[in-house]
Amino acid sequence: MKKSYRVKREKDFQAIFKLGQSMANRKFVIYHLKGEHKHFRAGISVGKKLGNAVTRNAVKRKIRHVLMELGDHLKSEDFVVIARRGAEELDYQAVKQNLHHVLKLAKLLEEGFEIEKKS
């Protein structure tokens, strides 16, 4: 994901947490806030309770990859994805389905967009 698509500064994270709305499912929480940018900006937070650094980085890579795939269909808002316990056990397809679900609940995806389900 390009740097312009990332929420990096602590000030931005705090603004999203304080002023934004949240939506959650069993594996992920999303806080979102209208931004001034022409595209979405995403921050990813994976706590130490999920495992060691290797495990946490693997979860972040999966989330980042899903967001890159869905990028054309995301609304231009700033949001933070927080991984909950159990997210480290998910494979890529499960991460994609769970993130799609919570993004849809938060109304961050374009109307009518659905991911293709592999059988």
Swiss-Prot record:
GO molecular function list: 3'-tRNA processing endoribonuclease activity; ribonuclease P activity; tRNA binding
Protein name per its UniProtKB record: Ribonuclease P protein component
Name of a matching Pfam family: Ribonuclease_P
UniProt EC number: 3.1.26.5
GO CC term, one of those recorded: ribonuclease P complex
Enzyme class: hydrolase
HAMAP family: RNase_P (MF_00227)
Function in brief: RNaseP catalyzes the removal of the 5'-leader sequence from pre-tRNA to produce the mature 5'-terminus. It can also cleave other RNA substrates such as 4.5S RNA. The protein component plays an auxiliary but essential role in vivo by binding to the 5'-leader sequence and broadening the substrate specificity of the ribozyme.
Record flagged with keyword Ligase: no
Organism: Streptococcus equi subsp. equi (strain 4047)
